[in-house]
Design a protein with these regions (language model features):
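Conserved C-terminal helix/tail region of periplasmic/extracytoplasmic solute-binding proteins
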Residues: 312-369
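Sec/Tat signal peptide C-region and signal peptidase I cleavage site
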Residues: 28-34
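A glycine-rich, aromatic-flanked flexible loop/lid motif
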Residues: 17, 215-222, 284-288
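Secondary-structure end/capping motifs
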Residues: 236-325
Protein backbone atom coordinates (compact mmCIF):
# COMPACT_ATOMS: atom_id res chain seq x y z
CA UNK A 1 0.00 0.00 0.00
CA UNK A 2 2.95 2.27 -0.52
CA UNK A 3 1.06 4.31 -3.08
CA UNK A 4 -1.39 5.24 -0.34
CA UNK A 5 1.26 6.70 1.95
CA UNK A 6 1.16 10.43 2.42
CA UNK A 7 4.13 12.47 3.55
CA UNK A 8 3.53 15.22 6.08
CA UNK A 9 5.31 17.76 3.88
CA UNK A 10 3.31 16.95 0.77
CA UNK A 11 0.01 16.88 2.60
CA UNK A 12 0.49 20.13 4.49
CA UNK A 13 2.10 22.04 1.65
CA UNK A 14 -0.63 21.41 -0.91
CA UNK A 15 -1.83 24.84 -1.96
CA UNK A 16 -5.43 25.91 -1.85
CA UNK A 17 -6.99 25.08 -5.20
CA UNK A 18 -8.61 27.77 -7.32
CA UNK A 19 -9.99 30.91 -5.78
CA UNK A 20 -11.47 29.68 -2.51
CA UNK A 21 -10.90 32.24 0.19
CA UNK A 22 -9.75 31.21 3.63
CA UNK A 23 -11.50 32.95 6.48
CA UNK A 24 -10.19 33.45 9.98
CA UNK A 25 -6.89 31.60 10.49
CA UNK A 26 -6.92 29.40 13.56
CA UNK A 27 -3.77 28.47 15.43
CA UNK A 28 -3.63 26.93 18.86
CA UNK A 29 -0.60 26.99 21.15
CA UNK A 30 1.53 23.87 21.12
CA UNK A 31 2.55 23.46 24.78
CA UNK A 32 0.57 21.31 27.19
CA UNK A 33 -2.75 23.00 27.90
CA UNK A 34 -4.64 22.81 31.17
CA UNK A 35 -8.01 23.65 29.60
CA UNK A 36 -9.39 21.71 26.62
CA UNK A 37 -9.11 23.36 23.22
CA UNK A 38 -12.52 24.19 21.77
CA UNK A 39 -12.94 23.02 18.18
CA UNK A 40 -16.04 23.95 16.17
CA UNK A 41 -17.40 21.01 14.19
CA UNK A 42 -20.33 20.95 11.76
CA UNK A 43 -22.30 17.87 10.87
CA UNK A 44 -23.49 17.50 7.31
CA UNK A 45 -27.12 17.18 8.39
CA UNK A 46 -29.45 17.11 11.39
CA UNK A 47 -28.16 15.29 14.51
CA UNK A 48 -30.12 12.13 13.75
CA UNK A 49 -29.19 8.57 14.71
CA UNK A 50 -26.56 8.30 12.01
CA UNK A 51 -24.34 10.66 14.02
CA UNK A 52 -24.74 8.86 17.36
CA UNK A 53 -21.06 7.90 17.35
CA UNK A 54 -19.91 11.54 17.30
CA UNK A 55 -22.06 12.45 20.28
CA UNK A 56 -21.16 9.24 22.12
CA UNK A 57 -17.49 10.08 21.65
CA UNK A 58 -18.08 13.46 23.26
CA UNK A 59 -20.21 12.05 26.09
CA UNK A 60 -17.67 9.33 26.89
CA UNK A 61 -14.76 11.77 27.00
CA UNK A 62 -12.94 10.51 23.92
CA UNK A 63 -12.26 14.09 22.84
CA UNK A 64 -11.77 15.50 26.32
CA UNK A 65 -9.04 13.00 27.20
CA UNK A 66 -7.21 14.25 24.12
CA UNK A 67 -7.52 17.88 25.19
CA UNK A 68 -10.41 18.68 22.85
CA UNK A 69 -13.78 20.32 23.61
CA UNK A 70 -15.77 19.55 20.46
CA UNK A 71 -18.57 22.05 19.79
CA UNK A 72 -20.94 20.20 17.43
CA UNK A 73 -23.42 22.05 15.19
CA UNK A 74 -26.14 20.67 12.95
CA UNK A 75 -25.56 20.81 9.21
CA UNK A 76 -27.56 21.92 6.19
CA UNK A 77 -26.17 19.56 3.55
CA UNK A 78 -22.72 18.39 2.58
CA UNK A 79 -22.08 21.16 0.05
CA UNK A 80 -22.92 23.75 2.69
CA UNK A 81 -20.75 21.98 5.26
CA UNK A 82 -17.62 21.76 3.15
CA UNK A 83 -18.03 25.36 2.01
CA UNK A 84 -18.33 26.50 5.64
CA UNK A 85 -15.24 24.56 6.69
CA UNK A 86 -13.18 25.72 3.73
CA UNK A 87 -13.72 29.42 4.56
CA UNK A 88 -13.17 28.99 8.30
CA UNK A 89 -16.74 29.32 9.57
CA UNK A 90 -16.11 25.96 11.23
CA UNK A 91 -12.70 24.54 12.00
CA UNK A 92 -13.71 20.97 11.19
CA UNK A 93 -16.73 18.94 10.15
CA UNK A 94 -18.00 16.02 8.11
CA UNK A 95 -19.45 15.87 4.62
CA UNK A 96 -20.10 13.31 1.91
CA UNK A 97 -17.10 12.22 -0.13
CA UNK A 98 -18.67 12.99 -3.50
CA UNK A 99 -19.52 16.52 -2.43
CA UNK A 100 -16.04 16.98 -0.98
CA UNK A 101 -14.39 15.89 -4.22
CA UNK A 102 -16.58 18.21 -6.24
CA UNK A 103 -15.81 21.05 -3.84
CA UNK A 104 -12.07 20.50 -4.22
CA UNK A 105 -12.42 20.61 -8.00
CA UNK A 106 -14.24 23.93 -7.59
CA UNK A 107 -11.52 25.49 -5.50
CA UNK A 108 -12.38 24.67 -1.89
CA UNK A 109 -9.38 24.32 0.39
CA UNK A 110 -10.28 20.97 1.96
CA UNK A 111 -8.36 18.14 3.58
CA UNK A 112 -9.92 14.73 4.28
CA UNK A 113 -8.71 13.16 7.53
CA UNK A 114 -10.76 9.96 7.73
CA UNK A 115 -13.77 8.08 6.39
CA UNK A 116 -16.84 7.31 8.53
CA UNK A 117 -18.65 4.88 6.20
CA UNK A 118 -18.18 3.29 2.83
CA UNK A 119 -21.48 3.71 0.96
CA UNK A 120 -23.18 7.10 0.70
CA UNK A 121 -26.52 5.43 -0.15
CA UNK A 122 -27.49 8.17 -2.62
CA UNK A 123 -30.66 7.79 -4.64
CA UNK A 124 -34.24 8.78 -5.38
CA UNK A 125 -37.18 7.80 -3.18
CA UNK A 126 -40.79 7.60 -4.33
CA UNK A 127 -43.85 6.20 -2.60
CA UNK A 128 -44.41 2.55 -3.49
CA UNK A 129 -48.10 3.26 -4.13
CA UNK A 130 -47.21 5.98 -6.64
CA UNK A 131 -46.47 5.91 -10.38
CA UNK A 132 -42.66 5.75 -10.18
CA UNK A 133 -41.35 2.19 -10.43
CA UNK A 134 -38.39 2.59 -12.78
CA UNK A 135 -35.97 5.43 -13.59
CA UNK A 136 -37.81 6.23 -16.83
CA UNK A 137 -41.00 6.85 -14.83
CA UNK A 138 -39.39 10.01 -13.41
CA UNK A 139 -39.92 11.85 -16.69
CA UNK A 140 -42.77 14.32 -16.42
CA UNK A 141 -42.84 14.01 -12.64
CA UNK A 142 -41.85 16.39 -9.86
CA UNK A 143 -38.71 15.64 -7.89
CA UNK A 144 -37.77 17.46 -4.70
CA UNK A 145 -34.15 18.30 -3.91
CA UNK A 146 -32.25 19.98 -1.10
CA UNK A 147 -30.23 22.77 -2.67
CA UNK A 148 -27.12 22.25 -0.53
CA UNK A 149 -27.33 18.47 -0.32
CA UNK A 150 -24.38 16.33 -1.32
CA UNK A 151 -26.77 14.07 -3.24
CA UNK A 152 -28.49 16.75 -5.34
CA UNK A 153 -25.44 17.55 -7.49
CA UNK A 154 -25.45 14.01 -8.89
CA UNK A 155 -29.04 14.04 -10.15
CA UNK A 156 -28.13 15.17 -13.71
CA UNK A 157 -25.42 12.49 -13.85
CA UNK A 158 -27.85 9.82 -12.68
CA UNK A 159 -30.35 10.85 -15.33
CA UNK A 160 -27.71 10.69 -18.05
CA UNK A 161 -26.46 7.26 -17.00
CA UNK A 162 -29.97 5.86 -16.43
CA UNK A 163 -31.28 7.07 -19.80
CA UNK A 164 -33.60 9.72 -18.36
CA UNK A 165 -34.26 13.01 -20.15
CA UNK A 166 -33.32 15.45 -17.38
CA UNK A 167 -35.19 18.29 -19.10
CA UNK A 168 -38.44 16.37 -18.60
CA UNK A 169 -38.05 16.37 -14.82
CA UNK A 170 -39.75 19.06 -12.76
CA UNK A 171 -37.10 19.80 -10.14
CA UNK A 172 -38.33 21.60 -7.01
CA UNK A 173 -36.01 22.93 -4.31
CA UNK A 174 -37.33 22.06 -0.85
CA UNK A 175 -36.19 22.97 2.64
CA UNK A 176 -34.23 20.05 4.07
CA UNK A 177 -36.50 19.98 7.13
CA UNK A 178 -39.52 18.94 5.08
CA UNK A 179 -37.89 17.00 2.24
CA UNK A 180 -39.27 13.57 3.11
CA UNK A 181 -42.63 14.95 4.26
CA UNK A 182 -43.09 16.60 0.88
CA UNK A 183 -43.02 13.16 -0.73
CA UNK A 184 -45.24 11.55 1.91
CA UNK A 185 -47.87 14.25 1.50
CA UNK A 186 -47.77 14.20 -2.30
CA UNK A 187 -46.35 17.69 -2.79
CA UNK A 188 -43.74 16.07 -5.04
CA UNK A 189 -43.64 12.65 -6.69
CA UNK A 190 -40.13 11.81 -5.53
CA UNK A 191 -37.12 13.19 -3.66
CA UNK A 192 -33.35 12.93 -4.03
CA UNK A 193 -31.94 11.57 -0.79
CA UNK A 194 -29.09 10.14 1.18
CA UNK A 195 -30.62 6.86 2.27
CA UNK A 196 -29.11 6.90 5.74
CA UNK A 197 -30.85 10.18 6.49
CA UNK A 198 -34.14 9.70 4.70
CA UNK A 199 -35.08 6.02 4.77
CA UNK A 200 -35.71 6.10 8.54
CA UNK A 201 -38.28 8.86 8.04
CA UNK A 202 -40.36 6.69 5.73
CA UNK A 203 -39.96 3.38 7.56
CA UNK A 204 -40.70 4.85 10.97
CA UNK A 205 -43.94 6.28 9.56
CA UNK A 206 -44.77 2.92 7.95
CA UNK A 207 -44.67 4.43 4.46
CA UNK A 208 -43.53 1.85 1.85
CA UNK A 209 -41.09 3.27 -0.69
CA UNK A 210 -39.41 2.57 -3.99
CA UNK A 211 -35.72 3.47 -3.98
CA UNK A 212 -33.74 4.11 -7.15
CA UNK A 213 -30.09 3.96 -6.01
CA UNK A 214 -27.49 6.02 -7.83
CA UNK A 215 -25.05 3.14 -7.29
CA UNK A 216 -26.89 1.01 -9.88
CA UNK A 217 -25.50 3.26 -12.63
CA UNK A 218 -21.99 3.52 -11.18
CA UNK A 219 -22.41 6.56 -8.93
CA UNK A 220 -21.16 5.03 -5.69
CA UNK A 221 -19.13 7.02 -3.18
CA UNK A 222 -17.85 6.85 0.35
CA UNK A 223 -20.20 8.28 2.95
CA UNK A 224 -18.71 10.97 5.21
CA UNK A 225 -15.15 12.21 5.50
CA UNK A 226 -13.82 14.25 8.38
CA UNK A 227 -12.91 17.56 6.78
CA UNK A 228 -10.86 20.60 7.66
CA UNK A 229 -9.16 23.36 5.70
CA UNK A 230 -5.54 23.23 4.64
CA UNK A 231 -4.96 26.44 6.57
CA UNK A 232 -6.32 25.03 9.83
CA UNK A 233 -4.50 21.73 9.39
CA UNK A 234 -1.13 23.33 8.72
CA UNK A 235 -1.34 25.32 11.96
CA UNK A 236 -3.11 22.71 14.10
CA UNK A 237 -2.31 19.24 12.77
CA UNK A 238 -2.11 17.65 16.21
CA UNK A 239 -5.50 19.07 17.18
CA UNK A 240 -7.12 17.85 13.94
CA UNK A 241 -5.58 14.40 14.34
CA UNK A 242 -6.89 14.14 17.89
CA UNK A 243 -10.41 14.97 16.73
CA UNK A 244 -10.20 12.18 14.16
CA UNK A 245 -8.86 9.79 16.79
CA UNK A 246 -11.83 10.56 19.03
CA UNK A 247 -14.25 9.98 16.15
CA UNK A 248 -12.64 6.61 15.40
CA UNK A 249 -13.08 5.59 19.02
CA UNK A 250 -16.70 6.76 18.92
CA UNK A 251 -17.36 4.61 15.86
CA UNK A 252 -16.00 1.56 17.67
CA UNK A 253 -18.22 2.24 20.66
CA UNK A 254 -21.34 2.50 18.48
CA UNK A 255 -20.43 -0.64 16.55
CA UNK A 256 -20.00 -2.72 19.70
CA UNK A 257 -22.56 -1.05 21.98
CA UNK A 258 -25.49 -0.03 19.77
CA UNK A 259 -28.13 -0.07 22.50
CA UNK A 260 -26.15 2.20 24.82
CA UNK A 261 -25.21 4.46 21.92
CA UNK A 262 -28.89 4.75 21.04
CA UNK A 263 -29.91 5.55 24.60
CA UNK A 264 -27.17 8.14 24.95
CA UNK A 265 -28.19 9.83 21.71
CA UNK A 266 -31.86 9.93 22.69
CA UNK A 267 -30.97 11.38 26.07
CA UNK A 268 -28.99 14.23 24.50
CA UNK A 269 -31.54 14.81 21.73
CA UNK A 270 -34.85 14.27 23.46
CA UNK A 271 -36.72 16.06 20.68
CA UNK A 272 -35.91 13.18 18.31
CA UNK A 273 -37.89 10.76 20.45
CA UNK A 274 -41.08 12.81 20.34
CA UNK A 275 -43.96 11.02 18.72
CA UNK A 276 -44.83 7.36 18.72
CA UNK A 277 -42.08 6.36 16.27
CA UNK A 278 -39.31 8.72 17.33
CA UNK A 279 -37.11 6.08 18.91
CA UNK A 280 -37.49 3.79 15.89
CA UNK A 281 -36.50 6.67 13.61
CA UNK A 282 -33.27 7.27 15.53
CA UNK A 283 -32.51 3.56 15.81
CA UNK A 284 -32.91 3.01 12.07
CA UNK A 285 -30.49 5.82 11.25
CA UNK A 286 -27.91 4.48 13.68
CA UNK A 287 -28.21 0.86 12.55
CA UNK A 288 -28.00 1.69 8.85
CA UNK A 289 -24.85 3.64 9.64
CA UNK A 290 -23.36 0.72 11.57
CA UNK A 291 -24.00 -1.40 8.47
CA UNK A 292 -21.97 0.84 6.15
CA UNK A 293 -19.09 1.20 8.61
CA UNK A 294 -18.18 -2.43 7.94
CA UNK A 295 -16.12 -2.75 4.76
CA UNK A 296 -12.80 -4.21 3.69
CA UNK A 297 -11.16 -0.87 4.44
CA UNK A 298 -12.20 -0.77 8.09
CA UNK A 299 -11.86 -4.52 8.69
CA UNK A 300 -8.35 -4.75 7.25
CA UNK A 301 -6.92 -1.34 8.16
CA UNK A 302 -8.91 0.01 11.10
CA UNK A 303 -11.74 2.48 11.59
CA UNK A 304 -11.47 5.73 9.68
CA UNK A 305 -9.24 4.29 6.96
CA UNK A 306 -9.49 5.82 3.49
CA UNK A 307 -8.44 3.87 0.41
CA UNK A 308 -6.72 6.54 -1.66
CA UNK A 309 -7.03 4.53 -4.87
CA UNK A 310 -10.81 4.44 -4.39
CA UNK A 311 -10.87 8.19 -3.73
CA UNK A 312 -9.00 8.74 -6.99
CA UNK A 313 -11.52 6.53 -8.80
CA UNK A 314 -14.49 8.33 -7.22
CA UNK A 315 -12.95 11.67 -8.17
CA UNK A 316 -12.83 10.59 -11.81
CA UNK A 317 -16.53 9.73 -11.69
CA UNK A 318 -17.31 13.13 -10.16
CA UNK A 319 -15.23 14.89 -12.80
CA UNK A 320 -16.85 12.99 -15.65
CA UNK A 321 -20.47 13.23 -14.59
CA UNK A 322 -20.96 16.07 -12.09
CA UNK A 323 -18.27 18.67 -12.70
CA UNK A 324 -18.67 21.79 -14.80
CA UNK A 325 -16.34 22.53 -17.74
CA UNK A 326 -14.70 25.21 -15.60
CA UNK A 327 -13.91 22.78 -12.76
CA UNK A 328 -10.29 21.72 -12.56
CA UNK A 329 -9.08 18.15 -12.84
CA UNK A 330 -9.03 16.36 -9.49
CA UNK A 331 -5.64 16.33 -7.78
CA UNK A 332 -4.19 13.03 -6.57
CA UNK A 333 -5.84 11.83 -3.36
CA UNK A 334 -2.49 11.71 -1.56
CA UNK A 335 -2.33 15.50 -1.75
CA UNK A 336 -5.50 16.07 0.27
CA UNK A 337 -6.24 12.80 2.15
CA UNK A 338 -4.61 11.48 5.30
CA UNK A 339 -4.60 8.15 7.10
CA UNK A 340 -2.51 9.36 10.03
CA UNK A 341 -5.04 8.04 12.57
CA UNK A 342 -5.93 4.84 10.72
CA UNK A 343 -4.93 1.40 12.03
CA UNK A 344 -5.05 2.69 15.61
CA UNK A 345 -8.66 1.79 16.44
CA UNK A 346 -9.49 -1.73 15.32
CA UNK A 347 -11.94 -4.54 15.98
CA UNK A 348 -11.10 -8.20 16.43
CA UNK A 349 -12.45 -10.82 14.04
CA UNK A 350 -14.94 -11.87 16.71
CA UNK A 351 -16.09 -8.27 17.14
CA UNK A 352 -16.57 -7.83 13.40
CA UNK A 353 -18.59 -11.06 13.36
CA UNK A 354 -20.76 -9.51 16.08
CA UNK A 355 -21.26 -6.37 13.99
CA UNK A 356 -22.04 -8.40 10.87
CA UNK A 357 -24.63 -10.48 12.69
CA UNK A 358 -26.32 -7.54 14.39
CA UNK A 359 -26.58 -5.47 11.19
CA UNK A 360 -27.78 -8.28 8.91
CA UNK A 361 -31.33 -7.00 8.44
CA UNK A 362 -30.10 -3.45 7.86
CA UNK A 363 -27.55 -4.56 5.28
CA UNK A 364 -30.34 -6.49 3.59
CA UNK A 365 -32.44 -3.33 3.56
CA UNK A 366 -29.64 -1.35 1.93
CA UNK A 367 -28.94 -4.19 -0.45
CA UNK A 368 -32.57 -4.29 -1.51
CA UNK A 369 -32.53 -0.67 -2.55
Amino acid sequence: MSSNKLTRRRFLSTAAIGTAAIGTGFSFPRPAIAQPIQVSYTLSWLPTGQYAYVYAARQLGYFKKRGIDLDISRGFGSMAANQAVSIGKFQMGSAQAGANLLGIMRGLDLRLLGTHGYDATLGIVALKKGPIKTPKDLEGRTIGVSAAGGDTVFLPAYCKLAGIDFDKLKVVQIDSKILEQSAMSGVVDSVVVTGLSSIPNFISEDVPITMLPFSTVGLQFYWLNTITSGDFLEKNKEVADQVQAGINEGMKFMLLNPQEALERHLKEHEELALGKNGKLYVELGMELTRAIMMASESVEHGLGYTDLAKIDAQAKVVKQYAAKPTDRDPPAAETFCSNSQAEQVTLTSAEWDQVKSSTKKYRELLGSL
